[in-house]
From Swiss-Prot:
Belongs to the NucS endonuclease family. Pfam families: NucS_C, NucS_N. This is Endonuclease NucS. PANTHER family: ENDONUCLEASE NUCS.
Amino acid sequence: MNCMKCKVSENPSIKEAYRLIEDGIRKRALVVILACCSASYEGRARSRLDAGERLIVIKPDGTFMVHQDRKVDPVNWQPPKSRSRAYIKRGSLYLESIRRDPEERLEVEIHEAHLVSYYLARDVHDLMVAGHENDMGDMIIMHPHLIEKGFRPVAREYAVTSGFIDILGKDENGSLMIIELKSRKAGVSAVKQLKRYVDEFREDRVGVRGVLVAPSITHDAMEMLEEEGLEFREIEPPRELRSNRGVTLDNFL
């Protein structure tokens, strides 16, 4: 099947598959291949994937993926800005994807191509998301009273030894407040994470408050929170769709 934006070839010969794949890569099209193939990777490690029926996708931005018939993630992949090519060696068809920094190479041997296609896709829209921790952070920065009256945020994604604090702020008395955000029910691991952040600051000062913010919390997590002298705020993440550009403290300084 051929049209102005796509070309498809079923059970192509090696030369037909090569020409179609190279044409798709040259045109910066979305290349989709169903084939029996094997793969080898060399870079920060080494791996070998024996022959099997798989889906191969080469995207216009250089992304290269080999999918099996199970699981969400590809079994082999190369990130955007990798360089892909097809070539024939000793009568076999190969695909190669190379990343320069760090130096990585993924080679796929096509043993039998069942379907080769490419599509001149055009997609300029960003994903609209809602309900993540970043959305909660934006909402709290814009409406700090949701934490409590007098709360003043001073930093986001504040780096400490044990990770990144979602929001760092001060209460109306000037005491430091560490805010840990969870967009779903918070568990014991969230409490432990918050405690690590608070402990780092309590080594140098007194009056540090840790607040876990989530739409709900497990019974065990609430017990641990109270035992550690930490606090909980029940706040639902915003549900309105928005672009992936977040609100920063610069908007309010």
